[in-house]
Amino acid sequence: MKNIMQSIFLLSLGCSKNTVDSERLIRQAELNGLHFTDQADDADIIIINTCGFIADAKEESINEILAATEKRHNGEIKALFVMGCLSALYSRELRAELPEVDHFFGTSDLEEIISVLGGSYRPSNIHERTLLTPPHYAWLKIAEGCSRTCSFCAIPKMRGRYRSEPIERLEKEASLLLKNGVRELNIISQDITQYGWDFDERSHLNDLLKKLAAQEFSWIRLLYAYPLHFPLDVIDTMREHANICNYLDMPVQHISDRILKSMQRGIDKKGTIGLLESIRKKNPDIRLRTTMIVGYPGETDREFDELLEFVAQLRFDRLGCFPYSHEEHTSAFKHLEDDIPEKIKKERVEALMELQESIAAERNRELEGRVMKVLVDEVEGSIAYARTEYDAPEVDNDVLVDIGDNPVQPGDFCTVTIEESSAYELHGRVNDC
C-alpha cells in the first residue's frame, strides 16, 4: 500500500498492554513518514487494536469494527485493519463475517502491519514509542504473553507463552521515556512476578527494579503481580528507594480453596493470606490493590461469604471486582457450567463493592490533615486533578486540589494538605508546587 499522503486513525481498546502495542505501531509508522489523525472522519485508513478478554470488551471491539466497516463499505476510508487480542482469537470467524476488513492481524504482527502500510519495520527503534498517555506518565511492558493456566483466562491463547524482555532493552526504553519527560513509570505485563523465569527459572523482577530505580524517575509503580512465587525482595527494594511507590497491584481473584484450585491459581487461602501479611509486615506503608471474580461456576453462598469475610479482614486499599465471564478458549468454558445466574453475579458484585467502599472511605479518612505529595494529571480552572503515590493512573483515587491562581500544569508535583475525603476522592489545598 502506498503511504503517500495517507492519514491513519488508530483506535486502541482494552488494557495498558494494548496501549503499548499501539504506541510502538504509531512510532514505527511515523518513522516511515506516515501521518496519524485524532479524528476517524479525517482518516484514509482506520486501525482498530481490539480487546478480547471478557464479553463486554469483545462487544465493544465488535461494535467499533462494525462502525468502521460501514465507513469502508461507503468508501469513506480506503482501508480498514483490525489487530490485537480479539483478532488473534477469532481471526477465522471475523474474516468470514467481515469481508469489509482489509487485513486482520494478531498481537505480534507489528512488522507485517508496517509492511502492509507501505513501510519498513525498524527493529533498532523498537524501544521507541509515541505515547497515547499524558506525557508525564507511561507504561513499561516488561514481558509479552503468559504461561499461567488460569481456568477463566484466554490470554495465553491470544498472546502466547511468557517472553521476558531483556533488562538492557528495558533500561534503554525507560531511559528514552525519562528523556522525553515521563516522570511516572508504571511497570506492567500480564504477570510481572514471572519476569525472567524464561531466562533461568527464577524471577528477575527485583534485578530489573533496582536498575530502573537508579534512573531519575520520580515515581515507579508495580502493577499486575501474580501471588504465586512473588519475590518478597521486591518489597525490600521498594522500601530502600524513595522513587518506588509504596503500592502493589496483586490480583487475588478469590479466597475459597475450592475455587482457587478450580481456577488453577497454584496457591491456596493460607498461602495467599500469608503472602499478603508478609508484604505488609515488610512495608507497613504499602497500599495494596487487588481484583476479584465473583459468580465463578459453582460459587456457593458460603464461598461468597468467605470472600466477603476475607476482604473485611485484609482491608485492601483498592479493589476491583468482575462478574465471572464464561469465555471460549478457556479451561472453565470447556469443563464447567456457567451455573450462577447473572442476577446473582450482579448482586454479589454490588455487595463486595459496597463493602470495599466502606473500607476505602475509612482508609481515606485516615489521610485527612496529612500533607501529601501529588502528581497533577489535569487542570480545570482553579481545580487540579491529581494522584498520590498510592494511586495508579486511570483506576484509583483522584485528589481534587484547590490551586487558586497558582500556575500549576499537568505533570507537576505539588504538596497538598488533605482536608476532606470520600471513598474514592481526596480534597485538598495546594501548599506549593
UniProtKB/Swiss-Prot annotation:
Domain TRAM, residue spans: 365-432
UniProt-listed SUPFAM superfamilies: Radical SAM enzymes
Binding site for [4Fe-4S] cluster 1: 15, 51, 85
This protein's record includes keyword Aminoacyl-tRNA synthetase: no
Enzyme class: transferase
GO CC term (a single one): cytosol
EC id: 2.8.4.4
Start and end residues of each MTTase N-terminal domain: 6-122
Principal place of residence: cytoplasm
Gene Ontology molecular function: 4 iron, 4 sulfur cluster binding; aspartic acid methylthiotransferase activity; metal ion binding; protein methylthiotransferase activity
Annotated [4Fe-4S] cluster 2 binding sites: 146, 150, 153
Catalysed reactions, as listed in the record: L-aspartate(89)-[ribosomal protein uS12]-hydrogen + (sulfur carrier)-SH + AH2 + 2 S-adenosyl-L-methionine = 3-methylsulfanyl-L-aspartate(89)-[ribosomal protein uS12]-hydrogen + (sulfur carrier)-H + 5'-deoxyadenosine + L-methionine + A + S-adenosyl-L-homocysteine + 2 H(+)
Cofactor(s) listed: [4Fe-4S] cluster
Compartments it resides in: Cytoplasm
The record's free-text note on cofactor binding: Binds 2 [4Fe-4S] clusters. One cluster is coordinated with 3 cysteines and an exchangeable S-adenosyl-L-methionine.
CDD domains: Radical_SAM
Biological-process GO terms, alphabetical: tRNA modification
Pfam families the record matches: Radical_SAM, TRAM_2, UPF0004
Domain Radical SAM core: from-to ranges: 132-362
Keywords of the record: 4Fe-4S, Cytoplasm, Iron, Iron-sulfur, Metal-binding, S-adenosyl-L-methionine, Transferase
Keyword S-adenosyl-L-methionine attributed: yes
InterPro entries listed in its UniProt record: Elp3/MiaA/NifB-like_rSAM, Methylthiotransferase, Methylthiotransferase_CS, Methylthiotransferase_N, Methylthiotransferase_N_sf, NA-bd_OB-fold, Ribosomal_uS12_MeSTrfase_RimO, rSAM
HAMAP family: MTTase_RimO
Family designation: Belongs to the methylthiotransferase family. RimO subfamily.
Function: Catalyzes the methylthiolation of an aspartic acid residue of ribosomal protein uS12.
Protein name: Ribosomal protein uS12 methylthiotransferase RimO
Protein species of origin: Prosthecochloris aestuarii (strain DSM 271 / SK 413)
Top-level taxonomy: Bacteria, Pseudomonadati, Chlorobiota, Chlorobiia, Chlorobiales
Gene from which this protein is expressed: rimO
